[in-house]
């Protein structure tokens, strides 16, 4: 096995460094896994990850969000609790974010060149500002509103 030194592997090493410096496990682990996949016999699975990675990530994120309800750590609110203004605002915020994410998926598919800028912005937010990497879809949705696409 020989290591591939290319701009992408260097980029992944930089991400790992930023993740460690920024104390962000998500970016560190993701970049490390992708570097290992790229540099080993697992590279044959990169097209699969490219095609299905976003969907798999959304499924895993959804499982993480729903698991406290399923485990009983968080109970489902009663109907009267849904009428609380904070709960209604939370529902509206959830609807808005889901809508933005949908617009973002359309924009990312229709204008793949913009994905690079969205990823760089997300990486900066994750590595340096303590954010989490759920931003590209929402960022793409916001961008679609700003540029009138999607």
Swiss-Prot record:
Claim: Transmembrane is one of the keywords in the record: yes
Keyword entries, A-Z: Cell membrane, Membrane, Transmembrane, Transmembrane helix
Pfam families the UniProt entry points to: DUF441 (PF04284)
Subcellular localization(s) per the UniProt record: Cell membrane
GO CC annotations, alphabetized: plasma membrane
Record bears the keyword Zinc-finger: no
Major subcellular location class: membrane
Membrane topology: Multi-pass membrane protein
Membrane-spanning residues: 12-34, 52-72, 82-102, 123-143
HAMAP family associated with the record: UPF0756
Family under the similarity heading: Belongs to the UPF0756 family.
Record's protein name: UPF0756 membrane protein APL_0366
Organism: Actinobacillus pleuropneumoniae serotype 5b (strain L20)
């Amino acid at each position: 096995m020989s290591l591939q030194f290319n701009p992408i592997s260097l980029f992944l090493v930089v991400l790992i460094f930023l993740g460690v410096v920024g104390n962000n496990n998500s970016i560190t682990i993701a970049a490390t896994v992708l570097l290992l996949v790229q540099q080993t016999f697992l590279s044959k699975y990169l097209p699969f990850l490219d095609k299905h990675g976003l969907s798999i990530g959304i499924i895993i994120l959804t499982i993480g969000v729903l698991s406290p309800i399923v485990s009983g750590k968080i109970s489902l609110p009663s109907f009267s609790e849904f009428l609380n203004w904070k709960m209604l605002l939370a529902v509206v915020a959830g609807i808005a974010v889901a809508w933005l994410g949908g617009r973002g998926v359309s924009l990312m598919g229709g204008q793949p060149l913009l994905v690079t800028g969205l990823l760089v912005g997300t990486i900066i937010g994750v590595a340096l500002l303590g954010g989490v990497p759920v931003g590209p879809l929402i960022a793409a949705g916001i961008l679609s509103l700003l540029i009138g696409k999607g």
